[in-house]
Amino acid sequence: MAQGLAIAATCSCIVAGCLFVADGQAQAQTATQTPPAQVTPAPAASTQAAPLSPMQEKALKPKDTFKECANCPEMMVVPAGSFTMGSPTSEPGHSADEGPQHTVTIARQFAVGRFEVTFDEWDACAADGGCNGYKPSDEGWGRGRRPVINVSWDDAKAYVAWLSKKTGKSYRLLSAAEYEYATRAGTQTAYPWGNAVGTNNANCHACGSQWDARQTAPVGSFAANGFGLYDMVGNVEEWMEDCYHDSYSGAPADGSAWIEGADCSSRIVRAGSWFFAPAFLRSAKRYWFTTDYRLNYLGFRVARTLAP
């Protein structure tokens, strides 16, 4: 990857490099930063560690959690519902590809990773013969419960393929609509917690956390959102299933991934990261990378389709 490539007139310099944005794409040059002095432990994981039976799956209700193997991601059940996707033109930081706003209806509950996929979870995949045996660099920040980084969209797809095979269940990446619905958790504000970035709500370039513009934080280091999900914005960017379109004209209204009518060599990323300015953490913000990009602020979380 060509780092620090100036592909646009819009540039926001962020400590270790400059973040460039054009036509929905973000590129950046980064460097290892001085580590913070303190680490906040993540919440304890669920004790469930076996594939759900059909009866157990049908009994699930919103905010229930489950794990389908010892090293599988902990999943949180998200309710069905409708929301307004995108942002109004009046929202600070709004870009044209966040419109037009439109109603999306998620007809069935589904499960979302309670946390971003961690190094522990990724390394278990590689050790089990999955993930193409790839061991991404942790930049010297540590592995364990930190989110996996330096993974491409292709890498993320290899992980969900392994997870699906291991559990016999339908794991996948989130659609962009599912992501925004789960991030907003019933809100229509710029951020999941309000219209201002505030202090210590997330890990970004200027979020007031001990990790800001330095490195990733252990997953679960900040308060959960209204659906009980952690780090839905900030910490690491997250790969989506969708291809990139420059507006929502013609977007699906059912929450499914939008893969028609676009160059799918590039896929949507959401959430912002430890390296990005606060505006990139807005619930509606969207941009894209080519599927082979591996960056030290880029990771993912998983979703799972549930039985009706």
Model-assigned labels for residue ranges:
Residues 84, 88-94, 137-145, 151-285, ...:
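Functional-site microenvironments in short loops/helix caps that host divalent-cation chemistry
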Residues 99-101, 107-109, 143-146, 214-216:
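Short, solvent-exposed beta-strand edge segments and adjacent coil->beta transition regions
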Residues 76, 111, 190, 238, ...:
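Residues embedded in well-ordered beta-strands
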Residues 48-68:
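Short coil-to-helix leader/linker segments, especially the first N-terminal amphipathic alpha-helix
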Residues 1-25:
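Sec-dependent N-terminal signal peptides
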Residues 27-55:
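Compositionally biased, proline/threonine/alanine/serine-rich low-complexity intrinsically disordered stretches
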Residues 296-308:
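Short, structured beta-strand segments at or near domain termini in extracellular proteins/domains
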Residues 67-133, 151-154, 234, 241, ...:
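A short glycine-rich, aromatic-capped structural motif
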